[in-house]
């Protein structure tokens, strides 16, 4: 399961704890109708959590079983409330929810989704070693998404279109840039090696892949230069458009 989905589930579980407290307050006000409606909302939330877990872990996963038991408890609780039985409602619901929370934390393995955005295959070696380590690690789902670029005309308009996705080594699984939906997937990290955005006078990547746009789709935008840095910092090497938007820079220094 993606780490961000796992975190969303844990956040939703916290809202269920709050709902249990709200239900207890409504019981004290003898508002049984509102209590039962709130418990139904809890059941719908639990079903949503279960569906998310089933998609990644399978329908027989242990956490799903705990959620099913929670839904049964919610139903029984609603029936009891309708019959005027209010004993240990919050305590019982919280106990079962705690079992679910522990299972989400301990039984569901979170995975990081990382996207690499090379544009020229000749510069792939700057990203390749990091990609390879992540690709071979079960904690990561990796996507190599080569992005198109254009030559610049003398007037700085876009000239010839280039896409080099078919030129990469055969052992590198390639995802076409039109097949990866950044807004839906929201990767945990994006790696780029072109920091210039609209500032390059010779070429330009497709504008929708400029760093200020990519930043909207991840919490960690990382720039890896495709050259070795000199021992003494050079201003022209670090003063580029993308550096206003990236979260980290990985560099290799000349010895």
Regions found by a protein language model. Name each.
Residues 112-255:
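Active-site and donor-binding regions of nucleotide-sugar-utilizing enzymes
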Residues 1-119, 136, 147-149:
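Non-catalytic N-terminal targeting/anchoring module and adjacent flexible stem/linker
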């Amino acid at each position: 399961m993606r780490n961000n989905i796992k975190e969303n589930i844990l956040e939703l579980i916290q809202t269920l704890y709050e709902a249990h407290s709200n239900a207890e307050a409504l019981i004290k006000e003898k508002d049984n109708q509102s209590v039962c409606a709130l418990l139904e909302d809890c059941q719908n939330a639990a079903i949503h959590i279960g569906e998310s877990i089933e998609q990644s872990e399978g329908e027989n996963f242990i956490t799903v079983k705990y959620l099913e038991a929670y839904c049964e408890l919610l139903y029984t609780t609603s029936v009891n409330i309708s019959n005027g039985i209010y004993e240990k409602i919050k305590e019982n619901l919280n106990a079962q929810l705690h079992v679910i929370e522990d299972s989400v934390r301990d039984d569901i393995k979170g995975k990081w989704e990382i996207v690499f955005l090379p544009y020229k295959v000749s510069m792939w070696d700057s990203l390749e070693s990091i990609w390879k380590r992540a690709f071979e690690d079960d904690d990561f789902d990796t996507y190599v998404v080569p992005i198109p670029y254009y030559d610049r005309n003398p007037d700085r308009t876009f000239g010839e279109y280039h896409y080099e996705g078919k030129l990469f080594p055969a052992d590198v699984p390639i995802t076409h840039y039109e097949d990866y939906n950044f807004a839906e997937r929201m990767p945990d990290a994006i790696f780029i090696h072109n920091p210039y955005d609209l500032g390059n006078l010779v070429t330009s990547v497709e504008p929708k892949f400029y760093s200020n746009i990519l930043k909207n789709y991840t919490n960690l935008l990382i720039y890896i230069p495709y050259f070795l840095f000199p021992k003494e910092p050079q201003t022209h090497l670090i003063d580029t458009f993308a550096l206003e938007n990236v979260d980290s820079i990985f560099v290799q220094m000349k010895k």
